[in-house]
Structure formats: C-alpha cells, structure tokens
C-alpha cells in the first residue's frame, strides 16, 4: 500500500512525522497522531483515530513508528481519493449546483450516457435514493446509494 505513494508524499510524511517525534526515537504517541494527520490535510475524527491506532499499534504500547504511520497514511489517502471521485460524480449529476439531484437532472445525465429511461424508471431511481422524501437526492443520499452497491 505504501508503495503507491510518491517519493514527495513519503518525504512530506517523514517530515511531519519527525516534527512530532520529540525525542527522536522513531515513534509518536497516539495523542500526537491526530495532530500529525491534520498537518497533512486529513481530518480524522476521534473514533477514526482510535480505530487507526488499534489497527496499527500491534503491540499496544501506545506509539506508532514511521513504517506503521506510512501504511496508515497510504490507506487514508486512498479513501480520500475515493471520496473525491464520489463528489465529482455528484457534481456531474447536480447540473445547477444547488446540492441536490432532481429527477430532471438525473434523466438528463442518464440520457447523455446513452440510457434512455422512462419517466417511471427515473422516478423510481429518485424514490430509491431519496431517504428523506423531499423528491430529490442530496449528497449523503447519493453516497449511500453508491456505497450500498
């Protein structure tokens, strides 16, 4: 996984890691992990940090060495890429940029993709995704549909 990072990314991660490795022993504490990740443009929640630590701190000593950190950051970067792809897909459907996909917008995009859908089929797609019942699909609903596939 870490081999998918560029040399520049590895260098950037090493610099950030070193900033928080106060005593130079090659390890940072779990508390410092969130600070390091935020300095690299990630925004992990407390729950995500706990999950990451339990995943990478195999010996349970409360510290993370650089190879463990690098593997975790590679996974996190991959997740971020996937999220950006989903946001981009949503923007394709959300023609007017109002944060919602209407039946008309869905029909327009599907037609451009070569899918000739009946009004009933488009309405059914909207109904299936529209969990709050407002007649259109917001970003959270859009993600839920994509992730459930």
Curated annotation (Swiss-Prot):
Induction trigger: By TGFB1.
UniProt superkingdom: Eukaryota
Single GO cellular component term: myelin sheath
Keywords: Calcium, Metal-binding, Repeat
Chain residues that bind Ca(2+) 3: 94, 96, 98, 105
Pfam families linked to this entry: EF-hand_7
Location of the EF-hand domain: 8-43, 44-79, 81-116, 117-149
Entry comment describing in which tissues the protein is expressed: Expressed in normal mammary, prostate, cervical, and epidermal tissues. It is greatly reduced or undetectable in transformed cells.
Residues reported to bind Ca(2+) 4: 130, 132, 134, 136, 141
Molecular function terms, GO-annotated: calcium ion binding
Binding site for Ca(2+) 1: 21, 23, 25, 27, 32
Annotated Ca(2+) 2 binding sites: 57, 59, 61, 63, 68
Subunit field text: Interacts with MYO10, the interaction is calcium-dependent and essential for MYO10 function in filopodial extension.
Function as written in the Swiss-Prot or TrEMBL entry: May function as a specific light chain of unconventional myosin-10 (MYO10), also enhances MYO10 translation, possibly by acting as a chaperone for the emerging MYO10 heavy chain protein. May compete with calmodulin by binding, with different affinities, to cellular substrates.
Family: Belongs to the calmodulin family.
PANTHER family the record matches: CALMODULIN LIKE 3 (PTHR23048:SF0), MYOSIN LIGHT CHAIN 1, 3 (PTHR23048)
Protein's UniProt name: Calmodulin-like protein 3
Lineage, highest ranks first: Eukaryota, Metazoa, Chordata, Craniata, Vertebrata
């Amino acid at each position: 996984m870490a081999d998918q990072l560029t040399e520049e990314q590895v260098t950037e991660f090493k610099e950030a890691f070193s900033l928080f490795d106060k005593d130079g022993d090659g390890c940072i504490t779990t508390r410092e992990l969130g600070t390091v990740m935020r300095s690299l443009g990630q925004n992990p929640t407390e729950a995500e940090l706990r999950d990451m630590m339990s995943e990478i701190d195999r010996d349970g000593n409360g510290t993370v060495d650089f190879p463990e950190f690098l593997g975790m950051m590679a996974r996190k970067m991959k997740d971020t890429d996937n999220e950006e792809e989903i946001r981009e897909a949503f923007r394709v459907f959300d023609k007017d940029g109002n944060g919602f996909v209407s039946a008309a917008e869905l029909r327009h995009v599907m037609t451009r993709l070569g899918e000739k859908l009946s009004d009933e089929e488009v309405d059914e797609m909207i109904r299936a995704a529209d969990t709050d019942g407002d007649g259109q699909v917001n970003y959270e609903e859009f993600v839920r549909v994509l992730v459930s596939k």
